[in-house]
């Protein structure tokens, strides 16, 4: 029972973690950009899917750094979706947990998210 409680506490801490904003505050000269948190290594580069390019969410406080990451995402084969400042990292991070669910349930680790824009 204790092991389960510890794991639940760890998951709860991850879900409310604000490490990105704390890092940005501790190191203001460094230009942090949050990206690649919702995909496995197998599909990080050239993520070919029949349904088209998957979407990678990113955020950060520096416009130039985000533009650089957006170019990397494009070169790697992703549709990029700018979610704003580093505050959005707290919303993006749980996507990693959601991404893991099919992996754990079905042992499939080659999936990605896609935003359908209208």
Regions found by a protein language model. Give the residues of each.
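A short, glycine/Asx- and small/polar-enriched loop/turn
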Residues: 50-52
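Active-site-lining helix/loop region of Rossmann-like oxidoreductase modules
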Residues: 54-118
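Rossmann-fold NAD(P)-binding glycine/threonine-rich loop
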Residues: 1-48
């Amino acid at each position: 029972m204790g092991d389960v409680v510890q794991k639940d506490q760890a998951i709860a801490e991850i879900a409310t973690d604000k490490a990105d904003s704390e890092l940005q505050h501790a190191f203001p000269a460094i230009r942090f950009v949050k990206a690649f948190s919702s995909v496995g290594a197998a599909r990080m580069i050239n993520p070919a899917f029949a349904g088209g390019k998957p979407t990678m969410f990113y955020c950060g406080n520096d416009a130039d750094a985000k533009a650089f990451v957006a170019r990397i995402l494009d070169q790697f084969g992703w549709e990029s979706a700018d979610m704003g400042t580093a505050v959005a990292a707290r919303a993006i991070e749980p996507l990693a947990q959601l991404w893991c669910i099919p992996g754990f349930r079905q042992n499939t680790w080659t999936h990605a998210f896609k935003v359908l824009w209208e």
